[in-house]
């Protein structure tokens, strides 16, 4: 019990550093599905992260960063986890949304991670939390795997990798191979000869397979949500506008289910955006 108390104290200090450096902390949009004995989805809930999960995340990030620093300093051939700044057109769209919500845009053309993190904190636990957090997340570039340490924008870290996680990933195993050879005393020359081409291929393959897995997960999630909502066709729900396009509004319910309200369905109503 005392060990957990000490770990919690360390977690609080890490979380404070996390906030101070401008790392982003999004409120989760992840859904939790309720299945009956036949495997049919009968309900959808918003998944909530508990304190234990947040503690694990902070320690995991620290371990991943520490290993990435070691690899960069030793000039090892490596697989880094990188994340670039958002594209300008996405930043412009986010700015327009903030203005329409009555918020001051807290950044210039190229927002820093710290500025976006402050925006997330400013709207946390407010009526605008969901729409702002959702759209800041959509503004972000996709993280990927690379053999060069170009930094992680979202975590506001110069060095990052995927060394450990609650579920083992291929990039974890790839760098375990490299680190195993390194700690056994292999020379930098032999490591470069053995792994230089490997880290290039592993980075490309891991990024591609991650995207394929995310697409599959998104499709399955959509199917479960549609299955759960099918008995409720025709009912009214309260939702939050999570996106605006020329063809309509995206509306998200409290349980994370999102749907499109087409503009032609609003033609009889006075609506100003």
Give the predicted meaning of each segment.
Residues 1-273:
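Electropositive polyanion-binding surfaces
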